[in-house]
């Protein structure tokens, strides 16, 4: 019954990349620009949030448009893993209890894109077509 959706797998891969990129960028804009405002964030600077904001903004934007997708996804996955262990793991054993479920999910979604690539709606795919 659901096999007919297999034909849309490449496009849905692009949709997943775009939505993930938008959400990741929003974390960066919250930390760097203060928009959208998030409670509990320290002011930007030499804090972990101050350093992670620009990374989320840059990596998220590149991931969103699908430029250098695999290396960007590799870096973002590693960044998410480090963030999980530095910020959340010490607060409890389970992600649902330590508030780390979102960053853990980002880590594995990015890791998936290292293997899967960006999908057809990406700058990478457009550059591949031109070559």
Label the predicted regions.
Residues 39-50:
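Perimembrane loop-to-helix junctions flanking transmembrane segments
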Residues 1-33, 48-58, 65-131:
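Extended, low-polarity transmembrane helix blocks
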Residues 36:
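Conserved catalytic-core motifs of eukaryotic protein kinase domains, centered on the activation segment
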């Amino acid at each position: 019954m659901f096999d007919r959706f297999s034909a849309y797998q490449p496009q849905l891969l692009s949709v997943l990349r775009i939505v993930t990129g938008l959400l990741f960028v929003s974390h960066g804009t919250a930390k760097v620009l203060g928009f959208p405002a998030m409670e509990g964030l320290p002011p930007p600077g030499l804090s972990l949030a101050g350093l992670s904001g620009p990374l989320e903004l840059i990596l998220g934007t590149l991931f969103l448009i699908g430029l250098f997708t695999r290396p960007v996804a590799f870096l973002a996955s590693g960044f998410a893993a480090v963030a999980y262990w530095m910020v959340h793991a010490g607060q409890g054993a389970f992600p649902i209890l330590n508030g780390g479920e979102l960053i853990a999910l980002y880590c594995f979604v990015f890791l998936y894109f290292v293997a899967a690539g960006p999908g057809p709606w990406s700058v990478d795919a457009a550059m591949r077509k031109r070559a």
